């Protein structure tokens, strides 16, 4: 039982470190991206699929 606890603790610790490193890398990438054109492109990529899904869903509801 003690070995299992040590293994789980080690996995938790390594996962936490990995998550922290990924977050730092993502923050550094966001800081490097200071150009407004890139930000606008990212917003468009997020926004248009959502609008498309909503319109498709509404057309399906109205068609029935």
From Swiss-Prot:
Tissue: Expressed by the skin glands.
Pfam families assigned: FSAP_sig_propep
Domain of life, per lineage: Eukaryota
GO biological process, one term: defense response to fungus
Key word Acyltransferase present: no
Protein location: Secreted
InterPro entries according to UniProt: Frog_antimicrobial_propeptide
Swiss-Prot/TrEMBL keywords: Amidation, Amphibian defense peptide, Antibiotic, Antimicrobial, Cleavage on pair of basic residues, Fungicide, Immunity, Innate immunity, Secreted, Signal
Similarity comment: Belongs to the frog skin active peptide (FSAP) family. Temporin subfamily.
Purpose: Antimicrobial peptide with activity against Gram-positive and Gram-negative bacteria and against fungi. Has been tested against S.aureus (MIC=1.25 ug/mL), B.pumilus (MIC=5.0 ug/mL), B.cereus (MIC=15.0 ug/mL), E.coli (MIC=1.25 ug/mL), B.dysenteriae (MIC=5.0 ug/mL), A.cacoaceticus (MIC=15.0 ug/mL), P.aeruginosa (MIC=5.0 ug/mL) and C.albicans (MIC=1.25 ug/mL). Also shows a weak hemolytic activity.
Name by which UniProt lists this protein: Temporin-ALe
Species of the source: Amolops loloensis
